[in-house]
């Protein structure tokens, strides 16, 4: 317990002295999305979501080409940091990074020093010293991507943090719905199952309601969050 408290104190101290950071990515003023990180769906407004969907549609055609190679991210270094098992999300990010020309490093929990007892803070500090451009993070702790974004110079993409959020999955789901129906306003969406512990459900509720969909949830009362109506359901 004392060790855990010491870790928290060390993290808080590090956060306080890590405010003067510079990011390698410049904000593109032509895009509606002008933020460094992608961590929470609930912080995305309608224009930002539509910006992601518009850009994503370009790569649907790109992925149908025989030669799927771009230099858009040439010279950029991306770390895939997956501290939970994943197949679809991890490989999707890996394929995307490589097709866009980035240098990609995959780090799994079993391959990291965290597996030997090193703190996440120490691991992130070490990786940050390698000057990465993007960190893609999957972790069982809620809010961890936000914490990491405050101690590194790289852009952070949340690939799932506990039962909190999974914004990229929700954006993909929104793109699928757009391809099928061509609109969002007036659509009635039902999300079924364990809503309380589903990060995908939470992110979908945030993004789809922002786009104008009517959201309904279906599941046992014990698996529905008590504050569900505050989420726009």
Q: Where are each of the predicted segments found?
A:
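Alpha-helical scaffold segments in soluble metabolic enzymes
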Residues: 5-12, 51-58, 126, 147, ...
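Positively charged, low-complexity intrinsically disordered leader regions
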Residues: 24-91, 95
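Phosphate/diphosphate ligand-binding glycine-rich loop within oxidoreductases
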Residues: 67, 71-178
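Phosphate-binding loop/pocket of nucleotide- and phosphate-handling active sites
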Residues: 2-23
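Secondary-structure transition/hinge residues
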Residues: 14, 18, 60-64, 181
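Thr-Gly-centered strand-to-loop micro-motif
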Residues: 40, 158-159, 192-193
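Glycine-rich phosphate/diphosphate-binding loop of Rossmann-like nucleotide-binding domains
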Residues: 83-95, 179-233
């Amino acid at each position: 317990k004392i060790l855990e408290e010491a870790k928290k104190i060390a993290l808080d101290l590090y956060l306080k002295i890590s405010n003067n950071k510079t990011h390698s990515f410049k904000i593109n003023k032509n895009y509606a999305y002008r933020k460094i990180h992608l961590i929470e769906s609930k912080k995305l407004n309608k224009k930002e979501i539509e910006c992601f969907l518009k850009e994503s549609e370009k790569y649907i055609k790109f992925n149908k080409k025989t030669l799927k190679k771009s230099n858009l991210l040439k010279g950029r270094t991306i770390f895939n940091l997956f501290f939970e098992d994943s197949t679809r999300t991890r490989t999707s990010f890996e394929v995307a990074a490589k097709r866009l020309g980035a240098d990609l490093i995959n780090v799994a929990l079993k391959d990291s020093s965290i597996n030997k007892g090193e703190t996440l803070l120490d691991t992130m500090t070490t990786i940050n010293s390698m000057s990465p451009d993007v960190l893609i993070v999957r972790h069982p702790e809620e809010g961890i991507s936000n914490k990491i974004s405050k101690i590194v110079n790289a852009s952070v993409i949340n690939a799932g943090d506990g039962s909190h959020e999974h914004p990229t999955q929700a954006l993909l789901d929104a793109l699928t719905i757009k391809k099928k129906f061509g609109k969002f306003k007036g659509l009635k969406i039902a999300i079924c199952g364990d809503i309380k512990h589903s990060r995908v459900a939470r992110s979908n509720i945030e993004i789809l309601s922002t786009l104008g969909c009517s959201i309904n949830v279906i599941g046992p009362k014990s698996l529905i969050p008590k504050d569900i109506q505050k989420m726009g359901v």
